[in-house]
UniProtKB/Swiss-Prot annotation:
Gene Ontology MF terms in the entry: glutamate N-acetyltransferase activity; L-glutamate N-acetyltransferase activity
Name of the protein in question: Arginine biosynthesis bifunctional protein ArgJ
EC number annotated for this UniProt entry: 2.3.1.35, 2.3.1.1
Annotated site, Involved in the stabilization of negative charge on the oxyanion by the formation of the oxyanion hole, chain positions: 104-105
Organism: Aquifex aeolicus (strain VF5)
Biological process (GO), any one: L-arginine biosynthetic process
Keywords: Acyltransferase, Amino-acid biosynthesis, Arginine biosynthesis, Autocatalytic cleavage, Cytoplasm, Multifunctional enzyme, Transferase
Gene it is expressed from: argJ
Coiled-coil residue windows: none
Annotated HAMAP family: ArgJ
Catalysed reaction, written as an equation: N(2)-acetyl-L-ornithine + L-glutamate = N-acetyl-L-glutamate + L-ornithine; L-glutamate + acetyl-CoA = N-acetyl-L-glutamate + CoA + H(+)
Binding site for substrate: 141, 163, 174, 252, 374, 379
Keyword hit for Amino-acid biosynthesis: yes
Length: 379
């Protein structure tokens, strides 16, 4: 396995005083694909890195600062992102256009750029082997725990780390995620796989329905082994789904992961829209927090999209227990309630009984601590 290096620095961006600068240094230029937030109010680092990604298919290093989003800071914010890339490139003696920049944290404050550049110098002077757990900790903001995973299938190794807990909503979330594969992938193949994986994972999670200004998800191919693209895609999907679920599990104030599976739809887009409506419903989320198998809220959310549903064909299951199929099944309410109380992952399945398409979204419950945390944390 190629030696990926990382360095950690401190620019004083976090109130806790914890390290807030991460530099990841690849042993050679690697094929990479990135997707960024769809939010029009983009951070300076997103604007800068998007410009590079449009013209560049390879990456040699990336730098992340945590604690300051560098967003709402105008042209100066973009310039600061460029200065961060320049500093990494200068110290590591690599092309500036092979250095990507990412920021996460509080919106609307200028980066103390001199401190950030000193933090980058510190990080680049203390390079060591990539530690997924440590990397996730450095880029975290309101996260309660680090997010990382590793998978191996034959010679194919897939691994990554992420951050995210609030402002989680499809397209994408308040999240950063970086996933690596040792498989050799041409750029167009990687891009196709990346788009598919993104839609099924990070674009199918929600915590609070709030879309962030700083999101990015990158997949980097180290090009060490030849492998079937389908195998590589499966492994990338597995690790990315794990990271996405960890983000949902860490939803601010969350006590449960909610898996919403809408099945037997006439089209995939219909299945997805209905799944997202249920996953985003505050009434569904609060019912789960209260351990209440309230299938009526699920039905109401399912019927709230532009796509019609037939209430006489509709089936609703919680924890595998049928609660509605054109009529209530109150005899299963206590079993469903027990599932909500005892299981960390709550399963909600909706059968439309009209076609063959399905979609899965992951969400979290929402309770008192979400309000407390976000009332006390400046965005």
């Amino acid at each position: 396995m190629a030696e990926i290096l990382m360095g950690v620095g401190n620019a004083g961006l976090k109130e806790s005083g914890n390290p807030d600068i991460l530099v990841v240094y690849l042993p050679y230029p690697c094929t990479a694909s990135f997707v960024f937030t769809d939010n029009y109010f983009k951070a300076g680092s997103v604007i800068y890195s998007e410009r590079i990604a449009r013209d560049k298919e390879r990456i040699r290093a990336f730098v992340v600062n945590s604690g300051n989003a560098n967003c709402g800071t105008g042209e100066e914010g973009i310039k600061h992102a460029e200065m961060m890339a320049e500093k990494v490139a200068q110290i590591l003696d690599i092309p500036k256009d092979e250095v990507f920049v990412f920021s996460t944290g509080i919106i609307g404050k200028y980066l103390p750029i001199e401190n950030v550049l000193k933090g980058i110098e510190q990080a680049c002077s203390n390079l060591e082997l990539l530690d997924l757990k440590r990397a996730s900790e450095v880029i975290s903001t309101t996260d309660r725990f680090p997010k990382y995973d590793f998978a191996k299938a034959g010679e194919v190794e897939t691994f990554g780390f992420a951050k995210g807990a609030g402002m989680i909503h499809p397209s994408m979330a308040t999240m950063l995620a970086f996933v690596f594969t040792n498989a050799n992938l041409e750029y167009l193949t990687l891009k196709r796989i990346h788009e598919s994986v993104t839609e099924k994972t990070f674009n199918s999670i929600t915590v609070d329905g709030c879309e962030s200004t700083n999101d990015a998800f990158g997949i980097i191919s180290l090009g060490e082994v030849e492998a079937d693209p389908e195998t590589v895609e499966f492994e990338l999907l597995k690790v990315s789904e794990s990271l996405a679920k960890q983000i949902v599990a860490d939803g601010e104030g969350a006590t449960k992961i909610i898996r919403v599976n809408v099945r037997s739809a006439i089209t995939e887009i219909k299945a997805r829209e209905i799944a997202e409506a249920i996953a985003n419903s505050l009434l569904v989320k609060t019912a789960v927090f209260g351990r209440d198998p309230n299938w009526g809220r699920i039905a109401a959310a399912a019927g709230s999209t532009e796509f019609p549903i037939d209430p006489f064909k509709l089936e609703i299951y919680v924890g595998g227990y049928l609660l509605y199929d054109g009529k209530p099944h109150d005899e299963n309410l206590e079993k469903a309630k027990k599932h909500l109380i005892e299981d960390r992952e709550v399963d909600i399945t909706v059968e439309l009984n009209e076609g063959e398409y399905e979609w899965v979204c992951y969400s979290s419950d929402i309770g008192y601590d979400y309000i407390k945390l976000n009332a006390e944390y400046t965005t």
